[in-house]
Amino acid sequence: MSAPMTTPRVSVIMPVFDAGRDLERALRSVAAQTFVDRELVIVDDGSRDPTTRALLDRAAASGAATVHRTENRGPAAARNLAIERARAPYILPLDADDWLAPRCLERTVPVLDADPAVGVVHTWVGLTGEHHGTWRTGPFEIPALLARCTVHVSSLFRREVWVRAGGFDPRFVEASEDWDFWLSAAAQGWRGHCVPDVLAYYHRGPRSRERRARLPGAANRRMQTLVAKHRALSERHLEDALGALYEELMQASTSLERIYDHPAVRLALTARDLLRGRRRET
């Protein structure tokens, strides 16, 4: 008789779509974690690329990951499916072109263990590819989150956070599903905690989803959905949110080349248009 399967402490969940060789780096980073009480759950979101499919087959055959294959529905739906199939009480999403520092789980898991009021643990993020530097994430607070996405998707959170937030919204196919998720989580009263060290890496390459999502039409549609969904939250925190927006715009204005591409500007313009529409209706 085989021994009963134990429940891991952490489920790393990964949506994959035609990631190619970037996937290999992400898989290695999970295997290199010093925190060993974990599992890796992958949802292949309809990949057609032979390299991607071969790497996933190898990961499944070796026992490094459980792989679930589905038709292409976008990363939000893929993450939701992965969490449904995951067994652990703690969840950490990892995109296939990003990776983790070896001590990421070792440094973040104890924070959730120590304080049940903390629902999300985020870390500083190393930027690679088209941008280089360090993203000092946070704060995980509603006014700041209304101004921009202050937390990277590769943050550790409790499964209960995902349940109470309603999961990742599959309407956000192009991007911002993480931003929406963090807003929903904060609205439920969850606190965040930042580990001020680079423990996750975000790679933005020429084929990255975020690059495509910054096209004006896609960005405007996404912001309209985000603002409409969280309108009540915005109204309750209007004064503080405007203060956070002001700070963001002042920081962005130091680089005029980037100001109109800044998420805070897009959000402010979308909110303005929606408010103008409301005034015309009254």
Regions found by a protein language model. Name each.
Residues 27-69:
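Acidic donor-binding segment of Leloir-type glycosyltransferases
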Residues 9-22, 26, 33, 43:
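A conserved hydrophobic helix/loop-capping motif in glycosyltransferases and polysaccharide synthases
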Residues 136, 142-143, 172-174, 190, ...:
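Nucleotide-sugar-dependent glycosyltransferase catalytic core
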Residues 91:
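Short aromatic/hydrophobic "clamp" motif used to bind/position activated sugar donors
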Residues 70-86:
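Glycine-rich, basic loop-to-helix element that forms the pyrophosphate-binding segment
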Residues 103-134:
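Conserved donor NDP-sugar-binding/catalytic core segment of glycosyltransferases
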Residues 174-181:
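Acidic donor-binding loop at a coil-to-helix junction in glycosyltransferase catalytic cores
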Residues 217-282:
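Boundary detector for helix-to-coil junctions that initiate low-complexity/charged tails
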